């Protein structure tokens, strides 16, 4: 069966699209870690949680938020969620401190990304599109932009506690998965910091929210994420005075079809 894409008049093969009807009562969860033991508070993350809750509701998802979970609680929350009824698709968002291949519970104990991915690859979720969104640092490297007019050399000296924390990490572990129908998006590149504005939230969620609100009606998820990546990468290029840091999100996909939202 073929239908027309309203955005450009192209024909879309319905067999190449995942079924994703809001009537199926799709579900999403948001894990929002802000206050940690021995780590800095993630001020501004509540702004992201509010944006995502609003966004998921508009996309037809029943969303539930969980704040300040320990490492064991993160795994148990994901386990219970993946074993419940989630409609045609599901979304899991985790916002926390992190490093390569892992993220942290508020108790400072790391959770391996591979363990979370394994929980999402269950028999009950076979052939259902699953989106895991990770909003966290993936290392302590800084993507510095080069600009010859007005670069602030002492920018990093103004946040000594933050960067001192980012240099003291648990051992990292790189993860991967070959399971189908799973897409994982990251707010930054492997090894790099993910930046967060204390009054507006993370760069990534700010742009992701705008992109999906503007384009979800006729654009599938992979293209929405690609546009989000572009906007985050170019976020401060229009600033003619100072450019200090840059950020490049990424995603990898094992989707076998296109995922459109029922909006």
Curated annotation (Swiss-Prot):
Interacts with ced-3 (via large subunit p17 or small subunit p13); the interaction inhibits ced-3 autoactivation. Specifically expressed in the hermaphrodite germline. The gene is csp-2. It comes from the Eukaryota. Pfam families: Peptidase_C14. Gene3D superfamilies: 3.40.50.1460, Caspase-like (3.30.70.1470). This is Putative inactive caspase B. SUPFAM superfamilies: Caspase-like. One of its GO terms (biological process) is negative regulation of apoptotic process. Residues 1-8 form a propeptide. Belongs to the peptidase C14A family. Disruption phenotype: Survival of touch neurons and several pharyngeal cells is not affected during development. In a ced-3 n2427 or ced-3 n2427 and cps-3 n4872 mutant background, no extra pharyngeal cells caused by impaired apoptosis are produced. In a csp-3 n4872, csp-1 n4967 and ced-3 n3692 mutant background, pharyngeal cells, that are normally fated to die, survive and 16 percent of animals have still 1 or more cell corpses that are morphologically apoptotic and are internalized by engulfing cells. In addition, apoptosis of the male linker cell occurs normally. The keyword Phosphoprotein does not apply. InterPro entries: Caspase-like_dom_sf, Caspase-related_regulators, Caspase_his_AS, Pept_C14_caspase, Pept_C14_p10, Pept_C14_p20, Pept_C14A. Keywords: Cytoplasm.
